[in-house]
From Swiss-Prot:
This is Glutamate 5-kinase. One of its GO terms (molecular function) is ATP binding. Disulfide bonds: none annotated. It comes from Variovorax paradoxus (strain S110). Residues 285-363 form the PUA domain.
Length: 379
């Protein structure tokens, strides 16, 4: 099925997560493919210089480590895989740093585990760092921290990580670059009747039946992981494109509105998806009461909540917990992720940010709840 929605999903995307797999990043297992990485970095630079924000999720550390260690086949022992990841991550980060710098774009290395994103405080810290980097025009290059996490090496995949990062930074779109042109109704290598899927709804159960299962010996995921990643990304309102990574100027053509690969469309708008997630799936831990001025800014303008506008704190909560923002009449205006614990919040009520360091000994954020981590409940 095709439609015009594909022409706008990437064209209108301001914040994009790009995931590239091992089979593309590496030169048939003989270390990193410098030319390919250089080409993607050139395209990333054009996107950033054009006003877009881009996060790169890249596989390749283990494959590069295998090459540097002289290993011809992927080992099975976890500690050997972790050793390869540690060795290879050095080269992977250096390659991206070099190629992005050649295009006058800064880069940053970020290693994450699923546990980092499952813990709300670490989630908030990771989000703040990534959003800051994007605001600086830097391209964060993210990989799983395979060296310290056994389960990710055994069962994880960077398709899932790409979707989690898309959720984390509230991306408008996820682009998964792979060694196939997209999704087919069956394996085209085995079934001559297989038809290419240009567009479908992310999360459609029929997609999982279509997807092939096995990946290459270098990587960890087949097409099924990409289908599930698109479903996860759609949960926060991000549409996903699965496309051939060697397609000339694939990223640039996608943002121009060209139809490349398979588009899996999120069925829920980004703000609506985030509001539903925060309102329905995270337990409310406490609340802050705000004065009339702060209430007006939150309600009418969707502004961040500053501690100077807070008049009271109820409940016991930690940084990263979900709290309610209420006006003087007890009406719930919004919900959001707290940047400070309840103990700290009580100290910060009615205080300007200039006094935070004196009161707490540090400054985490100037806001109690940032507008990017807040959803309005009324109005």
């Amino acid at each position: 099925m095709t439609s015009n929605s594909g022409s706008t999903a990437l064209r209108d995307a301001r914040r994009i997560v790009v995931k590239v797999g091992s089979s593309l990043v590496t030169n048939e297992g003989r270390g990193l493919d410098e030319a390919a990485i250089g080409e993607w970095c050139r395209q990333l630079a054009v996107l950033v210089q054009g006003g877009r924000e881009v996060v790169m999720v890249s596989s390749g550390a283990i494959a590069e480590g295998m090459k540097r260690l002289g290993w011809r086949t992927r080992p099975h022992e976890v500690h050997e895989l972790q050793a390869a990841a540690a060795v290879g991550q050095m080269g992977l980060a250096q390659m991206y740093e070099t190629k992005l710098r050649e295009n006058r774009i800064g880069s940053a290395q970020v290693l994450l585990t699923h546990a980092d994103l499952a813990d709300r405080e670490r989630y908030l810290n990771a989000r703040s760092t990534l959003v800051t980097l994007l605001g600086l025009g830097v391209v964060p290059v993210i990989n799983e921290n395979d060296t310290v996490v056994n389960d990710e090496i055994k069962f994880g995949d960077n398709d899932t990580l790409g979707a989690l990062v898309a959720n984390l930074v509230e991306a408008d779109a996820l682009v998964i670059l792979t060694d196939q042109k997209g999704l087919y109704t069956a394996d085209p290598r085995k079934d001559p009747q297989a038809k290419f899927v240009h567009e479908a709804a992310a999360g459609d159960p029929a997609l999982e039946a279509m997807a092939g299962g096995a990946g290459s010996s270098l990587g960890r995921g087949g097409m099924i992981t990409k289908i599930l990643a698109a479903k996860r990304a759609a949960g926060s309102g991000a549409s996903t494109v699965i496309a051939w990574g060697r397609e000339p100027d694939a990223l640039l053509r996608l943002v121009r509105g060209e139809s490349i690969g398979t588009l899996l469309v999120a069925q829920t708008a980004k703000h609506q998806a985030r509001k539903r997630w925060m309102a329905d799936h995270l337990q409310l831990r406490g609340a802050v009461t705000v004065d009339a001025g702060a209430a007006a800014k939150v309600r009418a303008e969707g502004k961040s909540l500053l501690p100077i506008g807070m008049t009271g704190v109820s409940g016991e909560f930690s940084r990263g917990d979900v709290i309610a923002v209420r006006d003087a009449d007890g009406v719930e205006l919004a919900r959001g992720l707290a940047n400070y614990s309840s103990v700290e919040a009580r100290l910060l009520c009615r205080k300007p940010s200039s006094e935070f360091e004196r009161l707490l000994g540090y400054v985490a954020e100037p806001e109690m709840v940032h507008r990017d981590n807040m959803v309005l409940m009324r109005g």
